[in-house]
A protein has these predicted regions:
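Conserved pre-ATP/AMP-binding loop-to-beta segment of ANL
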Residues: 24-43, 50, 72-77
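Conserved AMP-binding A3 loop
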Residues: 39-65
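Conserved AMP-binding/adenylation subdomain of ANL enzymes
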Residues: 62-77, 84-150
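Gly/Ser/Thr-rich phosphate-binding loop
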Residues: 123-126, 136-206
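AMP-binding/adenylate-forming core of the ANL superfamily
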Residues: 221-232
Length: 232
């Protein structure tokens, strides 16, 4: 029945086998996109009005990936816990991670995040401030007789060294608290329309309570209380 419905569909539907066979005969050049081709459409959160579909080109995404200065050894474990349809996760976790040769581990549910941290033992994670605050509540509720190194092993998996965060303001209090467990929290700022990172802190250059310095390909100015950004 499903096969019949597929055959009657208004759009052409390809089976996995068909796509695999087509790929065998295709050259690399035949699937190379143009820099100005639309790569994805990301919908905004609707902070200042109705949610909008943001059309990001191949060049938009590639420029952002290249401009974000993060260093990591190939094989670095990244646990992806944010939705991939958000630009922050798509670019920072997936595209930047792949460009560094990272091993991307996909979280199946926020309910399982802490469990999966102990399973995958990530080196780097992206989180929104609410996640950081929630994890700290768990740390703060633990028995005070448990050494912090042991608690960090149990909660974070023992290898977590950096959390990149954005999307909302993070109280600097949590940056200090996570540092006690050997985890560096680095804030950044961005928006979907900017592919999305505009500024970020790095391990080599950071300031607590700051969203970091603008990326090399971004120009920022303030006008009538608004932040105006131009980039590639």
């Amino acid at each position: 029945m499903l096969q019949e419905e597929v055959e009657d569909a208004p759009a052409k539907v390809y089976g996995i086998g068909e796509l695999r066979n087509a790929g065998k005969s295709a050259s690399a050049d035949s699937v190379c996109p143009d820099a100005e081709d639309i790569a994805t459409i990301i919908f905004t959160s609707g902070t200042t009005g109705k949610s909008k579909g943001v059309m990001l080109t191949q060049n938009n995404l590639a420029s952002n990936v290249e401009a974000v200065k993060i260093t990591a050894e190939p094989g670095t474990a990244v646990l992806s816990v944010l939705p991939i349809h958000h630009a922050f996760c798509l670019v920072m976790d997936w595209l930047k991670g792949f460009s560094l040769g990272a091993t991307l581990c996909i979280n199946d549910s926020l309910l399982h995040m802490v469990r999966n941290m102990s399973i995958f033992k990530p080196d780097i994670m992206l989180m929104v401030p609410m996640m950081i605050e929630t994890i700290y509540k768990r740390l703060a509720a633990a028995d005070t007789s448990i050494p912090k190194a042991v608690l960090a092993e149990n909660v974070f998996g023992g290898k977590l060294r950096i959390i990149f965060t954005g999307g909302a303001h993070l109280d600097p209090y949590y940056i200090d608290r996570f540092a006690e467990y050997g985890v560096e929290v680095l804030e950044g700022y961005g928006m979907s329309e900017c592919s999305p990172v505009i500024s970020n802190n790095t391990s080599e250059n950071h300031k607590k309570g700051s969203i970091g310095k603008p990326l090399e390909n971004a120009e920022i100015r303030f006008e009538n209380g608004e932040i105006l950004v131009k980039g590639s």
